[in-house]
Amino acid sequence: MKRTIIMMLDSFGVGASADAASFGDVGSDTFGHIAKACAEGKADIGREGPLKLPNLARLGLGHAAMESTGAFAPGFGDNVELIGAYGHAQELSSGKDTPSGHWEMAGVPVLFEWGYFSEHQNSFPKELTDKILARAGLDGFLGNCHASGTTILEELGEEHMRSGKPIFYTSADSVFQIACHEETFGLDNLYRLCEITREELEPYNIGRVIARPFDGTGPSDFARTGNRKDYSLEPPAKTVLDKLKEAGGEVVSVGKIADIYAYCGITKKVKANGLEALFDATLAEVKSAGDNTIVFTNFVDFDSHYGHRRDVAGYAKGLEYFDARLPEMLALLGEDDLLILTADHGCDPTWQGTDHTREYVPVLAFGAGLKAGSLGRRKSFADIGQSIASHFKLEPMAYGESFL
C-alpha cells in the first residue's frame, strides 16, 4: 500500500536562500535563530533551556540546516543516529508567500509576478474598494493599510463593532485581508464579502483574499477565531494532487491546504484548528487512509501564531510539541509509505518587521526505500512534487527532480 504523508511546518525555514538579498532577508534563519535564542536562555517563556527536537534531528533536521547555512545550529550536531533522508530546497517561485511555496512543492512553481498593494497607507485603489462596497451594500471600511493582524484588531476592532465597517488590510504578500467580528458583523457576511472581493480582484492578480474573523469585547480580549478562510487563485497548471486525483487516488487536506489550492486536486477536507487538533486529525486520517492516498497537513500555527508575531519562545514550544508527537506518526507508516516534512517559506521570529523571510526550506523524507543520508541542495521545491509523482508512478511533472 503506497501513501504519502506531507507534514508542512508553515514558515519553518532553515537559513537565508541564495536570492535573499532581493527580498531584504540576508541573514535570516528561522530554525537557527530559534535554536540560538533557546541556547542563550532567551526563549524560556512556557518552556526552558536548549531547543530539544530529538525526533526531527534523527530525521535529519540539524544536518539539513547545517548544509544550508554551513554550521550546525546550537544544540544540534553529528551525535545523532540518522534514520531519514535530508536536504534543503531553494524556491524557484518569484515570491515568498504561501500559495507560491505550496504550489511549487506540488510541482507548479509560480514564475509570474503576483500583484501587490505596496503602499503602506491608503493601500487599496479607490476604484476597487468602491466596487466592493457597492456590491456588498456597505457604506465604508476601516484600515486601508499594511498591518499586523493582531495589532489592527487592537486599534480598530471597537470602531468596527460600533460602525459595522469591515477592516481591510494587507502586507508584503500578495493578499487582501478582511477582519470582521463573528457576532456583530456575522461570519456568513464576512465570507460573502470575501467572495465579492475575490471576484473584483481578478484584474489585480492578487494571490489570496483571507477572511479573518475575530471575537471578544474589546482590545484586551479580541482574538482571531478558528474560522479563517482563504480564497486563493487556482494554480496555473495541474499539480501532483490533481494528477493523483485523476488517476483515481485520494487527496486528503487537513487544515488550510484545500483553500491554498482552491480545492483543486482535493478529494476530502478535514477542518482542524491548533497544533494539537491538526496533529490529531492527521493521525486519524493516516490510520484510515487506503492505497494511493496523500494526506497533506499545513501546521499553520508556526507561521500565524509565532512567526508573524515574532514569538520566539512560542515557536520553540510549538516545535518541541510537534517533535514529541512524531513517534506517533512514525508508528503508523507502512513499508511503502513516504513521509515528507517541509516548509513553504521562512518567517524568522527574530527578524525585523512581521513578514515572511526568503529562506531555504528543509526536505526531510522517510520511508519508501529511502536510505538515511543527504539529499543535498534541491534546486526547487518542485523536487517534492516530482518525488511524489514518482512514488505513485504518475506522469512526470514539468518541474523538479525526484529524490527517490
Curated annotation (Swiss-Prot):
Binding annotation for Mn(2+) 1: D10, D344, H345
Species the sequence originates in: Shewanella baltica (strain OS185)
Known cofactor(s): Mn(2+)
Pathway connected to this protein: Carbohydrate degradation; 2-deoxy-D-ribose 1-phosphate degradation; D-glyceraldehyde 3-phosphate and acetaldehyde from 2-deoxy-alpha-D-ribose 1-phosphate: step 1/2
SUPFAM superfamilies per UniProt: Alkaline phosphatase-like, DeoB insert domain-like
Task performed by this protein: Isomerase that catalyzes the conversion of deoxy-ribose 1-phosphate (dRib-1-P) and ribose 1-phosphate (Rib-1-P) to deoxy-ribose 5-phosphate (dRib-5-P) and ribose 5-phosphate (Rib-5-P), respectively.
Reaction catalyzed: 2-deoxy-alpha-D-ribose 1-phosphate = 2-deoxy-D-ribose 5-phosphate; alpha-D-ribose 1-phosphate = D-ribose 5-phosphate
Keyword Glycoprotein: no
Lineage, broadest ranks: Bacteria, Pseudomonadati, Pseudomonadota, Gammaproteobacteria, Alteromonadales
Entry protein name: Phosphopentomutase
